[in-house]
């Protein structure tokens, strides 16, 4: 009856209800609710599989009350792919009930008061408008918020993106290779300074940078919310855009986009379609420490006098198993005081922007607060992270407590170190 859930039966039976997930699951630690912990969610999905439970509103709320951070997956003693079970349950909900029926379960679209979540909803609304055709089901769900001005205050260059679509990011003489830059919606619309840093760093290191004009968002948000068809549409569009660009490598500075392109595209399109594309995709930190650049510690770098700490994005650390590359970049920069944060790998509750933009915003902030004491204990002036969604989440959490910190991507700090050392000012 529910074929998408049925596909997860082998994973479901691996769960022995041991309760180890209660130690690790951020939503459980923030709520102490059994339905919030992975064990409880698997029990509910199993009940649907056995015909003991329908796809009710309550079931849907429980399935969407998960950050999809993979913390439990990487700590499960029986290696249950918990995140896949939950994502498949969401996909079944979308297929069986439709997006319009789930709209008010996923999103709080009330307009009675000023809410921080309106920024997130307006961003996602813009993402839908920019990337999806008019007949896509998501278009019929709009508006998700009428607080456009909330977004305009967050959006630094909405009408003037950091890259001219259709142009090249930058020419260099005798380039090492031609690199395609996948920008991603969050960097394109919220943090264009990260995008400019990517282009500047790659040019300084003798790479030609191409920004394909027809690239769209990675599709991470849509696949995570259970819409496989839209995720597949976006995956095909991006694969085609970069194939036409004929690049040697594809880099992105948004770790959620890297995760989606490396793993999500295989899920929605299959290995045969994505094999060539996947072989070219790199998170920018991975690319810069992969040997294609050469040893960063041998590259002329000027001192950067900052005291920094590092928050590890779940998509990069748990999803892609790439904990080291960002820290290798920081370690290579002279003058930088890098203070390791206790619990750097702890989830911030953003869910790559997806969890924090829905009805779970308040819960996401409660999860983020676990990081507060650890951040403050470092006495760092700058928090470095490889995910723009983590940056927004943690900066909002700190601001709610009256604390302001500078946030930078590893590539921005590398840009500072290269500036001047390469004769670029």
Spell out what each predicted region is.
Residues 12-18, 22, 63-73, 215, ...:
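Residues immediately within or flanking Cys/His clusters that coordinate Zn2+
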Residues 11-16, 34-35, 44, 219-220, ...:
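A generic short-segment signal for beta-strand/edge and adjacent turn/coil regions
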Residues 26-31, 54, 108-110, 378:
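A ubiquitous short alpha-helical element
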